[in-house]
């Protein structure tokens, strides 16, 4: 996230008003794309894939203002030992790989370093604590994909995230 923000600052210093900087899935953007439309990026479906080849889209995030978007997940960087999957996200409380139900956490924030930090933190803290933290952190919105008690993928997002989800019609928003 930090590197994306630094490059964005360099572009702005050169007078560039419309850009999208993506480094390793961390994105800083401002203005519009070459077609005059708001920038759109995809959130991948959390499918186990250590190769990074699978790129099926779960959701689209659209940003029409300056900001950062980052997604952290446990479905690409992991290892399996004795039949158990270990994610690359380390829980700072234990020093061991995080064992939470969150598969993917996407954050929209004013800058990418903030989005990146909270996306990783949400992965480590788990759904309940992430939900509570988001209520107390001004300027961030979240979209989380998690595994429920039956192993089925579910989504949850903050109310403010709806403004960045162009594929969700108003009627669907009111019913969720």
Q: What is each stretch, according to the model?
A:
Residues 1-176:
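Mature catalytic core of soluble alpha/beta enzymes
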């Amino acid at each position: 996230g930090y590197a994306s923000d630094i490059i964005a600052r360099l572009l702005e210093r050169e007078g560039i008003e419309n850009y999208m900087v993506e480094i390793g899935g961390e994105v800083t953007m401002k203005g519009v794309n070459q077609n005059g439309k708001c920038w759109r990026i995809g959130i991948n479906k959390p499918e186990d894939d250590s190769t990074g080849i699978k790129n099926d889209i779960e959701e689209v995030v659209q940003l029409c203002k300056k900001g950062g978007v980052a997604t952290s997940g446990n479905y690409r960087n992991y290892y399996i030992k004795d039949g158990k999957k270990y994610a690359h996200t380390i829980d700072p409380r234990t020093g061991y790989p995080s064992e939470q139900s969150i598969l993917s956490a996407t954050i929209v924030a004013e800058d990418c370093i903030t989005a990146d930090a909270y996306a990783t933190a949400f992965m480590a803290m788990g759904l309940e604590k992430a939900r509570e933290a988001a209520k107390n952190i001004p300027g961030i919105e979240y979209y989380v994909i998690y595994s429920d008690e039956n192993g089925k993928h579910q989504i949850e997002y903050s109310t403010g995230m709806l403004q960045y989800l162009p594929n969700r019609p108003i009627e669907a928003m009111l019913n969720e």
